[in-house]
C-alpha cells in the first residue's frame, strides 16, 4: 500500500512572468537548478511525456511523466505514468515586474517505510530541498535577465 506525501514551497522572483515561465517550462534545463535531478529528456515524438532521472549518493530513481495541464504563464501540472510515483504542479503568479513561483510535489511512499521513518523528518528534508531548488532557480533567472540586459 502506498501513502502519498505532499509538500509545497514558494518564492518570489524579481523578474517578469514571461521570462520566469520560459525558463521553467524548458524542462530539460531543470538539472541546472534542481540538484537531485540528474537529467530530463522530453520525448521528441510526444512532448507531453518526459523521462526523469533523480540521483543522489548511492540511490537513483527514474520515471516517465506526463503533462496533465499546461496554461502559459500560469501552471504546469504533471503526473508520473511509470516508475517513481509522483505528481504535482508548478504555479506562476504575475506580480507586475516580479513573479511568485509555487511548487507542489506529491510522491508515493510505501506504507511500511512511513512507519519506519519519521514523516515530519522526511517532510523537512524534502521541503528544504525543494526550497533550495527554488532559490537556485531564482538566482538562475536573475543571472539570465542580467545577461539579457547587458547584451542590449
Where on the chain are the PLM-derived regions?
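Hydrophobic ligand-binding cavity/cleft-lining segments
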Residues: 1-45, 139, 152
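Hydrophobic-ligand-binding modules of eukaryotic lipid transfer/binding families
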Residues: 1-12, 52, 98, 131, ...
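Short, surface-exposed coil-to-beta transition loops
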Residues: 6-8, 60-64, 85-89
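A short, structured loop/turn motif at beta-sheet edges
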Residues: 14-17, 44-46, 69-73, 91-100
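Hydrophobic pocket/interface hotspot
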Residues: 20-24, 30, 50-52, 67, ...
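Short beta-strand segments that buttress and anchor functional surface loops
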Residues: 50-56, 76-82
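Short, cysteine-centered beta-strand-loop-beta hairpins and adjacent loop/turn segments enriched
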Residues: 55-62, 109-113
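Beta-strand/loop substructures that line and gate deep hydrophobic ligand-binding cavities in soluble
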Residues: 80-132, 139, 148-152
Amino acid at each position: 500500500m502506498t501513502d502519498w506525501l505532499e509538500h509545497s514551497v514558494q518564492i518570489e522572483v524579481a523578474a517578469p512572468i514571461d521570462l520566469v515561465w520560459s525558463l521553467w517550462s524548458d524542462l530539460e534545463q531543470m538539472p541546472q537548478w534542481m540538484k537531485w535531478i540528474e537529467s530530463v529528456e522530453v520525448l521528441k515524438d510526444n512532448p507531453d511525456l518526459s523521462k526523469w532521472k533523480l540521483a543522489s549518493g548511492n540511490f537513483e530513481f527514474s520515471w516517465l511523466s506526463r503533462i496533465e495541464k499546461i496554461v502559459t504563464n500560469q501552471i504546469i501540472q504533471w503526473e508520473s505514468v511509470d516508475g517513481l510515483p509522483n505528481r504535482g504542479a508548478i504555479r506562476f503568479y504575475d506580480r507586475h515586474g516580479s513573479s511568485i513561483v509555487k511548487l507542489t510535489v506529491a510522491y508515493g511512499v510505501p506504507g511500511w517505510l512511513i512507519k519506519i521513518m519519521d514523516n515530519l523528518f522526511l517532510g523537512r528534508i524534502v521541503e528544504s530541498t525543494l526550497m533550495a531548488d527554488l532559490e537556485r532557480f531564482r538566482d538562475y533567472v536573475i543571472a539570465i535577465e542580467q545577461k539579457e540586459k547587458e547584451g542590449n
